[in-house]
Amino acid sequence: MGGKAQNGEDEARGKVLSSLPPSLVPYAELMRVHRPLGYYLNTSPYVVGVVFGAAVAPTKLPATILLDRLLILVLWSLFLRSAGCVWNDVIDMDLDRQIARTRLRPLPRGAVSSWNAVMLTAGIFACGGSLLSFLPRECAIEALIEIFFALLYPFGKRFTDFPQLILVNIGWAIPMSMHSLGLDPLAYKKPTFFMFLFIALVIVMIDVVYSRQDTEEDMKVGVKSMAVRFKHSIELLSYAFFYASTGALLAAGYYSGLGIPFTVLSVGGHFGGFLYFLKTTGVGKAPQVESYAKLACLIASLFWVVGLFVEYYLRV
């Protein structure tokens, strides 16, 4: 089963990359266009943030406004994710050469120069930044915070056992999405805090589980991570993040005054989707972790959004 799943993933990646001109393939690899999991994880918080903002806003927001903000923020998240991946490979090139799963990436194998990769990073960030002119000023400040942590992240694994905590910054998608709708997150302090915390816990949980597949090699080359630090209690840690994220989502709904649709669909979908992920992967032991993570994230995020959308739709 695991071998078939892995072969399926490799085939899908091959189809994506083979559809591009050969000269662009290494750059597409740097941007991880063939690895949709990261795009799910970076895009879904903005989608959730917009629908969450719509569900808690004092008046019912026009659907056209929501769709406009969704388009801009989803595009921003794609640029942010792509630039972060390229930058990560620039900083990690010496480490990637020593790890089996990463040693054939474009920079370690010499398909792209470091200078070109740095220029690509800057260009992608610039393209993403151009979108911010269509959003309120507060969104630009939050985007700068996200960029700062995206640039910082690859250094974390060299100096701390907790680099995954830097990924907490992805939770900034919630206040940024609310600001894009003209809402002040500070006017909804508890709901915003718990939704931010929810997103942060989910992202860290997935990254910790995903990192487990590299634990042995990471230890050999000196890469630090929570998966390495807690290698003997990774199941306990992962389930702690899972239950804490469920509690945070419940709290966000409670303090927002959201009702049964949110609790049943958003919270229930999250609980079922990621419990399935942890069980089927053995908390990162199974070889098809990425495949199950994509499925769990897709299912759970759909339920997050559907529950919030129903709450928005039912408003008078």
From Swiss-Prot:
Disruption phenotype: Completely abolishes the production of novofumigatonin as well as asnovolin A. Its EC number is 2.5.1.-. It comes from Aspergillus novofumigatus (strain IBT 16806). It comes from the Eukaryota. CDD domains: PT_UbiA_COQ2. It catalyses: 3,5-dimethylorsellinate + (2E,6E)-farnesyl diphosphate = (3R)-3-farnesyl-6-hydroxy-2,3,5-trimethyl-4-oxocyclohexa-1,5-diene-1-carboxylate + diphosphate + H(+). The keyword Transmembrane helix applies. Pathway: Secondary metabolite biosynthesis; terpenoid biosynthesis. Belongs to the UbiA prenyltransferase family. One of its GO terms (molecular function) is geranylgeranyl diphosphate synthase activity. Keywords: Membrane, Transferase, Transmembrane, Transmembrane helix. It is found in: Membrane. It is a multi-pass membrane protein. GO terms for cellular component: mitochondrial inner membrane. One of its GO terms (biological process) is novofumigatonin biosynthetic process. The gene is nvfB. Its main location: membrane. InterPro entries: Prenyltransferase, UbiA_prenyltransferase, UbiA_sf. This is DMOA farnesyltransferase nvfB. The chain crosses the membrane at residues 47-67, 71-91, 115-135, 139-159, 162-182, 191-211, 234-254, 258-278, 294-314. Pfam families: UbiA. DMOA farnesyltransferase; part of the gene cluster that mediates the biosynthesis of novofumigatonin, a heavily oxygenated meroterpenoid containing a unique orthoester moiety. The first step of the pathway is the synthesis of 3,5-dimethylorsellinic acid (DMOA) by the polyketide synthase nvfA via condensation of one acetyl-CoA starter unit with 3 malonyl-CoA units and 2 methylations. DMOA is then converted to farnesyl-DMOA by the farnesyltransferase nvfB.
